[in-house]
Amino acid sequence: MPKPLNNTENNLNTNRIKDLIKKYSPPFWVYDADIIYKKINLLRKFDVIRFAQKSCSNINILRLMKNKNVKIDAVSLGEIERALLSGFKPSTNEIIFTADILDEETLLKVAKYKIPVNAGSLDMLKQLGKISPGHHVWLRINPRFGYGHSKKTNTGGENSKHGIWHPEQAIPIIKKYKLKLIGLHMHIGSGVNYLHLKKVSQAMIKYAFQLNQKISSISVGGGLPIPYKFNDQPIDIKKYFMLWDIARKKISKFLGEKIELEIEPGRFLVAESGILISKVWATKKMGNKNFVLVDVGFNDLMRPTMYGSYHHISVIYGDDRKMNEKETIDTVVAGPLCESGDIFTQKEGGTVQTRKLPTIKVGDYLIFHDTGAYGAAMSSNYNTRPLIPEILLKNNDSIVIRRRQTIEEILNLEK
């Protein structure tokens, strides 16, 4: 859950943030490596931890993962290149490519480096088999149901593009091209609960029995939730592992094979390690609503606009005023973009909400919590706004792991 800025449990506290504000001009992202390490250690019972790098794809974060023996999931050619640059080895199981299509350039890359492919469509198997017989593959199965904190994060069922609906149809293709099936994969969406978790683990058992193929691994996918709100409960990792371990043992006994249990977290490993630091540049009254405008928009943090996602917001005064947190004002927090939807306090569907925040003035700072996942990774240049820096806190030091982009760099692509 969001940690108050007066906490002493990690580096994301008021004193450290004030030092960073002096050293690096806002806006910028901050990650605490120690928090990432702690989250990795919570998952050590799984045989393989495979980081969903789409959640936070900075190569310096990937190197942290590599140093802790975390493997990598890539979902694009660019993510394959990031993984290779970060030190992950091809022709092993350190990198797996997961997708529903294989364009020509990506196909040639995975074939050249023998990167295992987690296939979400039958066409992928055919295309891969034609140029790379014997290639190691997984089947991403759509279990015909899904779950998500938003409709847009539901990755199962007939409204989802992800996965293979009839996995039994994949077996003749695999045999025709002499592909090597090594694993089965399921991922039904983000923010899964225990009821759906049990359902998907039972589905994995069902499909493993029906297909009856000699595999070496099953992947539970990702979707592990984190508590974005103070009243959210953290997931019980022991219970999560136990449910999947039962499934693994049943499949292992049926197939007569040792089965490795993989997990593919993204948000769980990095979300709570990150904050977004912004500066207030305007306040205004619009009818009965109080607006505070900061120098980051949905081009930086997309989740509130795209999903109606909640991020806790803290305030640090830019002067020596004393804060009375008991005296709050219902406040709408918005960004600088030329878009009505550039509001951080909204529900899914765009309904504007308010947050109870202290009195805020121009020159104060707003801190968005738990932005380490799907924050910087989803940033864009919309409104021709440059990407902002990323700062990593590690070994009592702060390191710029992505410098501030310039407008000239954006325009150079078009010359």
Curated annotation (Swiss-Prot):
Molecular function per GO: diaminopimelate decarboxylase activity; pyridoxal phosphate binding
Pathway it works in: Amino-acid biosynthesis; L-lysine biosynthesis via DAP pathway; L-lysine from DL-2,6-diaminopimelate: step 1/1
EC number: 4.1.1.20
Catalytic activity line of the entry: meso-2,6-diaminopimelate + H(+) = L-lysine + CO2
CDD domains given in the database record: PLPDE_III_DapDC
Cofactor: pyridoxal 5'-phosphate
N6-(pyridoxal phosphate)lysine found at: K54
Gene Ontology terms: biological process: lysine biosynthetic process via diaminopimelate
Subunit relationships: Homodimer.
Family: Belongs to the Orn/Lys/Arg decarboxylase class-II family. LysA subfamily.
Its job: Specifically catalyzes the decarboxylation of meso-diaminopimelate (meso-DAP) to L-lysine.
Name under which the protein is recorded: Diaminopimelate decarboxylase
Organism taxonomic ancestry: Bacteria, Pseudomonadati, Pseudomonadota, Gammaproteobacteria, Enterobacterales
